[in-house]
Amino acid sequence: RSKYELGTGELKSSEIYFEKPEIFLELARFISKERLPLLVELVDKKYCVATSIVNHHIMPPYYMPDESDGRAQYIRNGLADYLTANLPDGVYRSFFKACKQPTEENLLSSMSELKSFFEGEKQKLDFAELTVKSIDETIDDYRIMKSRIGERAAIEKFVPLPDLTARGVKVNLLPHVHSIFNLIARLNKYHLKNISDVTLFHDKQKDFDHILMQCKEYLETTEVSENIPPVVNSDFDLNESLSLEFVDSEDCVGVQVADLLAGFFNRYVNGLLYKEVDVNEIYHSIFSEFRRNFRPMSPLGVNFVIPASKQQIIFRKFNF
């Protein structure tokens, strides 16, 4: 703090990133030199929503063949990539409405608008016609399920289920959920399933603590299906339970440092890949320093939950 005149308050990435980036460079060099384990989930929220649309309206898993070879997931990722870049806001709003008010009318309207979008893409998109057929099949699947298990239960198969806060408030499409799932699974792989002595510290989340704890307990009690796409950097099959503690970030320097790191990766990738601004060379040097300890198939490093088209830009730049 004295070296960089930071004062005694809580460390804030939003201030340090632009005003004193050399702090990140020193931090990156220290982490690299000491070979400290670094696990980051870098999430494009719009891409997560697009992925949910694909999973529920285009390629729901209910009648899919064996997915363990990863081919179906590869197709899903490609569709989500395209939707992120091209789907009109109105179609997103229709999907949100179906999530918040899951009625048959809203569900079918959401699917219909998505189908209309791809029908309009047939002249320029080689997979548009197949996607339209997939949506038609999803609508048929819904009607079949409705006849078997009833309308309400069937609707819930084709929209993402909301998470519930401790007060019973519904929260739709919370990105924290997939991030905590992935982090725990990555820690499980890194520690070779021996995680009973591992404690994961998280800054207090007034509305989301309960949800994150529920996610942890779900992973610990749910048997992993063999019919899932391969995930090389994670192990979702937990034999032991880790501890998850929520702390006040003002009183925990470790959580503040984690926030600094998360803020760096978020701002760097946002500037480089999304805003496409002229990024100062020091930021490239910082990322390159972190990159030194990233290994293929390792649970350590950055998990880029962003469109593949964006991934490839940074992968080529830093030789992933």
Model-derived regions, located:
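Phosphate-ester processing/binding pockets and catalytic centers
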Residues: 1-320
